[in-house]
Amino acid sequence: AKMVVVDIDHPDIEAYIQWKVREEEKVAALVTGSRIVSRHLKAILSACVNCEGPEGDCFEPMKNPALKRAVRDAKKAQVPENYVKRVIQFARQGYTDIEFPVYDTDWDSEAYLTVSGQNSNNSVRVTDAFLEAVETDGTWDLRGRTSGKVTKSLKARELWDQIGYAAWASADPGIQYHTTINDWHTCAAAGDIRASNPCSEYMFLDDTACNLASLNLIQFRKPNGDFDIVNFEHATRLW
């Protein structure tokens, strides 16, 4: 996994906020669409194969009532017409079954492998100035990264609502409070903290390592059940 952080005044911030939502919607479309198409194509093929009329009539919707219904239902469900024609041609060639891939919403499924953004944690970097604009229903300027010029102005609450909806719909983006984080910065003279590791436990300067550590707390349990505070404090200082 990786962490991707974009500033709230970035000119592409709206597309970034909606990125994961759109990709999740693609998965929903793939899963639902594949099931609908598969069901209707099989129904069309079945109407051709199980026809009891003259052989030539079995593949003509105007002469095969069951096929006519199946084709009509498929068109109502928005199944592409070329697929409808193709499966009828398939039946003419003597085939009695058809394979059409059906996708599911499993995290490791092919549907998710076809969309982007699945290997990153996305967060938006917000400042106190932006939050104040949200609170007062003010406008917010998006600025070019190199020129600093305003590329778009919009209501701060509109942007905030986009963040809220996207987080509800797809669990991304997260929020990083830039002003607060840097108010607590222990090395402020070295520059701003602008991002974190993927889970946001560790925040520090650009291009510095994220060396996470853990302690087995059971090792600090004394024989009488008390917690060994002295040794625990010593261990934490080592990190």
Q: Where in this protein do the model-derived segments appear?
A:
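Active-site cavity-forming subdomains of large catalytic enzyme subunits
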Residues: 1-234
